[in-house]
Amino acid sequence: MWAAIPARADPKGETSSVGFEIAWLLRQPDSALAILTRGPNVVYEPQSPGPIPAALLVGQAWAEKGDTIRARGSFDAARRTLEAQVRTDPTDADGWSWLGLSYAGLGRAPEAISAGRRATELLPTSRDAVEGSGVLMRLATIYVRSGDTSDAVAILRKLLASSSAGFVCSVQLLRIDPTWDRIRADPDFKTLLADPGTPSGTAP
């Protein structure tokens, strides 16, 4: 259904973004790619006021399919766009967090974490509980894709305890989102899903 929507009917990519998210959670990367291929080059997610290069999501879908070459090509295209974006506006928290995810997709962990942390400094949850939670969730994703399970779990715990973060982080979402597959065997992550109130570290 989503892939059948013509690009002209989705000029800002909002429908493409929602369709991608549904396909992602249903573990249907081929459907996700079909949706993005028909959509615009820049999309907008409901939880992010700023633009997102569709190439970043395309890279995510290719990585889920195990096609590392195509994934790297897409992540690198997103990187170039986002680096230009934060050069133009160094205070763009969303731009920094999406850039961090593109670095993580390229295996550039130190740069990914640095960019993700910069985003949380620019837009902490203390300043904007809703949009700041989205930025913080992306940092958790960067951590897990960079192999840092403990910091990822600490952030997830903080978000689960927040009344303003339910739209980006819930036990139900964590259970079905493929993003977290690589840490499902981790004892702290298992405990988090069973009892999100159990202490297990401090989020940055």
Per-segment meaning from a language model:
Residues 1-204:
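Alpha-helical protein-protein interaction modules
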